[in-house]
Amino acid sequence: LGSASVHVKLIKAAQEMGIYTITTDNVPYEDSPGKKIADEYWNLNIYDVKEIVKKAKKEHIDGVICGWLDPCQRPYFQICHELGLPCYGDEKQFFKMTDKHAFKKMCEENNVDIIDEFTEADIKGNKVEFPVFVKPVDSRGSRGQAVCYTMKELLSAIEVAKEESSNGDVLIEKYIKGSQEFHVTYFFVDGEPYLLRTSDNYCGSEEMHMEKVVSCAVMPSRYTSQYIEKAHPNVVKMFKNLGIKNGPIFMQGFEDNGVFRFFDPGLRFPGVDYELVFKKVFNVDLMKAMIQIALTGKTDVVIPKDAAFIKGGRASVLYLTIRACTISHLDGE
């Protein structure tokens, strides 16, 4: 489900397993890397659950999977549910890992630290401490997000964020500046969590208006040992309480003077290709594990317990935030 570049590795994995692979979304073929390599493609919007289910029944589809694309998460569950096919999450799990208010409440219930939030009552009572960060409750990427330094900017940003939110709900949080952005990814196998990845993420410059856009991630995070000691136990407890059995889960947050504060979740992998690095280092194919889950509901993948430390090595992922152009050269070792 979804034909973007982050799903190319998933399509290739299925094909290597000898599985006839179909991909669908409403993106034109020429702009869709997944459609160019799939055995077959449909031009059905990922939100058109009714038509996808209808066609899937007609074609006798054996499994459905996504795993890397944020907007596919809830439709993925709905499609699997209607078809009676395995799905690595249920309705409650996908809701709590896509709705930021529900996620923050779950964190509070499990003693996982979050970012301080302001309410409409705080606005009316003039109790907002600027600067603040405004965002839709469930939009993807940086859509509808804004940093606000005045009440005028805040009121304007709220209206923009509401337009990008599926239900008109928005979040108003304390703007964290100067702290290290920190990501964490887990993979569950038969109810047991494995810490796959920690990363320190670096955003672009304010001068180029790229301060909200990640340009580079370095793995493992320099705070990994500290995270495992201070936050990991409660995070694992939270996910087990949520009932996660198999599949990926990740969170974005900040390291804030020894406190790990999380703000954005996903019942999926982050939208990068780190799993290819993981495969190269450990000879463990997480994409094929996802295909197993799609077909059987389980996976026999074996993940090293200290995987997040990458055997003592380092890795980085660069995010090319550039306009359409021709790259003249690349340097490096």
PLM features per residue range, with description:
Residues 1-93, 297-301, 305:
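ATP-binding N-terminal substructure of ATP-dependent carboxylate-amine bond-forming enzymes
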Residues 50-51, 154-156, 324-331:
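Short, conserved charged micro-motifs
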Residues 62, 168, 240:
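Short acidic/polar active-site loop segments enriched in Thr and Asp
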Residues 96-171, 176-178, 189-191, 221-233, ...:
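Active-site nucleotide/adenylate-binding loops and adjacent lid/helix of ATP-dependent enzymes
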Residues 132, 194, 261-264:
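Protein kinase-like catalytic core scaffold
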Residues 174-244, 248, 255, 266-294, ...:
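ATP-dependent carboxylate/phosphate-activation module, predominantly the ATP-grasp catalytic core
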Residues 291-333:
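Peripheral (often C-terminal) accessory segments that flank ATP-dependent C-N-forming ligase machineries
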